[in-house]
Amino acid sequence: MKSYVYHSATATAHALIEHLIAMMEREPEKTFYFAFSGGSTPSLMFDIWANEYKEVTPWMRMRIYWVDERCVPAEDYESNYGTMRRLLLDEVGMPDEYVYPIYGVNRPEIEAKNYSTLVCRTVPLWGGFPAFDVVLLGAGDDGHTSSIFPGQEYLLSSFHPYAVSYTHLRAHETLANL
């Protein structure tokens, strides 16, 4: 595995975007399936992508999913989907039919089941599991990723792509992981 080190979050975002675009350029007939998480680094990346790479990105060959979501409406500033919608998707005119949000206002257990079904129906499967081309994760200061916090490692062995992760941070910050 290769490792890359960049001098800033901005440089990292540029490098990642350029890598993703190059990956898509190598297979011009392929549809690519992406799963994104939230947080400060993806927000920076979304803003840069919309403002500096809009014209060179093959948006119509991308299908957008989420790794996790908070149980809040899309309009809430803490919504991962809402953040990406405002910073990137609306800016580049991404058609709704290529965007598959987790609905944070639904009951977490029901939405985790519904989203698992949706992902398994719309993303190519490998060994019975969704085979995304890219899953972009971050890591919180407390060591969490994909809404899986220390002590919740049991979620990694779920038979479903998405499960509910109740956190210790805030009562509304709950759903889901890939």
How would you name each of these model-derived features?
Residues I48-P58, G82, R86, P150-F159:
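A glycine- and small-aliphatic-rich helix-loop capping segment at beta-alpha/alpha-beta transitions
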Residues L20-I21, L44-Y53, R85-R86, S116-C120:
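Short, well-ordered amphipathic alpha-helices
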Residues A112-K113, T145-G151:
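A short secondary-structure junction signal
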Residues T167-T174:
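Conserved small/polar residues in nucleotide/adenosyl-binding loops
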Residues S43-M45, H144-S147:
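Short glycine/serine/threonine-rich phosphate/pyrophosphate-binding segments
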Residues M1-Y33:
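N-terminal glycine-/serine-/threonine-rich phosphate-binding loop
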Residues F36-T41, L137-D141:
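Glycine-rich beta-strand-to-loop/alpha-helix junction loops that act as flexible
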Residues W59-L136:
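Ligand-binding beta-strand-loop-alpha-helix segment within the catalytic cores
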